[in-house]
């Protein structure tokens, strides 16, 4: 468990950011939150590139997502925290598995991780990724977020749209039985997204790791047991959710 630094009296120590003429109120609040975030401090101490690494670590502890020898695609990988975690978990240093990190932005190299600076929406992206992986992916994971506008409904719709694009990409690169994990923001459109995922995966649920800030609407959608195109066609013809279970689990710790 990650706890904030404490003073001699046992109370958490807080860093207060002084007001600056060139700094907006929102940026000042963000900076103060970062400075007082125990996960930010721990990430620096342990060598992770971002606090988001702990979100994947915690989700993996609960769902056993990362297995040795897996082939993984990390969408919107910058700055690389999730790829770092996955590399350790799948045994990349021992020559096991394969990870391809994709982003429009360049990232500092991660030992053993292949990087593709590209748009995953490019027509040739799925084919290129499968070639780089040496086969279909076992896991497509995404911690991507659209640029925030500050308008909750707009931000929700934008990230749901981004996840829908990631799902379409995953359909083209995942191996049967594969897993899809992506960040979303609550706001009302989750049901439609989950219904779409249930056509392709045997189980769909929401996950909110402890490292996600309690006051944040952020959560993750986890879909396991990818059916593949043939199984999906049979499911559609039958007019059911398939032989597996498909459930939407309400997020906790809101």
UniProtKB/Swiss-Prot annotation:
Record's Gene Ontology CC terms?
cytoplasm
Sorted keywords for this record are:
Cytoplasm, Methyltransferase, rRNA processing, S-adenosyl-L-methionine, Transferase
Q: Does S-adenosyl-L-methionine count among this protein's keywords? A: yes
The organism's superkingdom is given as Bacteria
What EC designation does it have? Answer: 2.1.1.166
Is Transmembrane set as a keyword in this record? Answer: no
Region (Disordered), start-end ranges: 1-28, 231-254
What's the gene? rlmE
Function text: Specifically methylates the uridine in position 2552 of 23S rRNA at the 2'-O position of the ribose in the fully assembled 50S ribosomal subunit.
Q: What is this protein called?
A: Ribosomal RNA large subunit methyltransferase E
* Biological source species: Xanthobacter autotrophicus (strain ATCC BAA-1158 / Py2)
Indicate where this protein is primarily found: cytoplasm
Describe the family membership recorded for this protein in Swiss-Prot or TrEMBL: Belongs to the class I-like SAM-binding methyltransferase superfamily. RNA methyltransferase RlmE family.
- Give the reactions, separated by semicolons, that this protein catalyses: uridine(2552) in 23S rRNA + S-adenosyl-L-methionine = 2'-O-methyluridine(2552) in 23S rRNA + S-adenosyl-L-homocysteine + H(+)
Protein location: Cytoplasm
Q: Which SUPFAM superfamilies match?
A: S-adenosyl-L-methionine-dependent methyltransferases
**The organism's lineage?**
Bacteria, Pseudomonadati, Pseudomonadota, Alphaproteobacteria, Hyphomicrobiales
Q: Where is the active site?
A: 183 (proton acceptor)
